[in-house]
Amino acid sequence: MSDFDRRKFLKSAGAVAALGGLGVFGPGVNGSAFAQSGSATERNQIIKKTIPSTGEKIPAVGLGSWITFNVGNDIELRDQCADVMSAFFNAGGRMIDSSPMYGSAQDVIGYGLDKLGARDQVFSADKVWTSGDGAAQIAETSDRWNITQFDLLQVHNLLGINKNLPLLFDMKDQGLLRHVGVTTSHGRRTDDLIAVMKNERLDFVQVTYNPVDRKVEDYLLPLAYDRGIAVIINRPFRGGSLVERLAGQPLPEFAKDLQVKSWAQLILKYLIAHPAVTCPIPATTKPAHAMENMAAATGPLPDDKMREQIAAVIGVLV
């Protein structure tokens, strides 16, 4: 990245604040005005981010399924997960992310999509997680989702990447897959992921990022921005522990300028305001929380200065 482009990247939010003097982006990404509830009109006004490699726009908050959707064959729990999916879709969400690593989550997502008749609403994101036969695992994943073409398949935690990444590229070239990605989490193998980003034509990467875990800010996010790679954020709440530790603490005074009602929304706005971030994927078992998370993809976003304030306040409290 050139010095000019790096300065542009790092200062993009701050420039808006300097022009407006408000400390927030307004009215939001793509220049639309945003509301907080879930009517059809407001779903159309949700903040969207662009996938650089294709120009497609997707809602700026998605839905993860790690642990929360691993409920086995319990029909009551499956229906609860379907209720979460319904709330998510009704609030304007699209991307749902899973993995063969997540137990029964893939089956539960497939169950929910069948029950809701929502296959035309979902941006389907899953992973290949094997050092063995990746094609066989992908076929099984497709059966579990009951879906013929995924919007995104990712090499999970770089496992078997020398075999699995070429497999995904071949699928994309044959029209069997729309986007290719690679994931990591917990800050592991960041250097290995960066090497792949430099040498392969990826559509997506997925990494851990939140106001406490900020390692990717130093190099990986600028690299993704420079190379036109979309970025999915896992563990935005540190598996829920970050929000739990903030529970009971009052929101900072400046949060009212962002129209947020919870720490979860403040964290998500911190993330989606970053110019390289495409879509955080918080997981939940509660429909109300799915709606709350999607509401973070509405209204004004923090500028660079306010993002630093958010990180500083949370850093002190946790």
Residue ranges of model-derived segments:
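Glycine/proline-rich, positively charged
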Residues: W129-K215, Y219, Y225-I232, A273
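Hydrophobic packing residues within well-ordered alpha-helices of enzyme cores
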Residues: I109-G112, L168, L193-V196, A290-N293
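Active-site-proximal loop/turn and secondary-structure-junction residues that shape catalytic pockets
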Residues: I67, P100-Y102, V128-T130, L159, ...
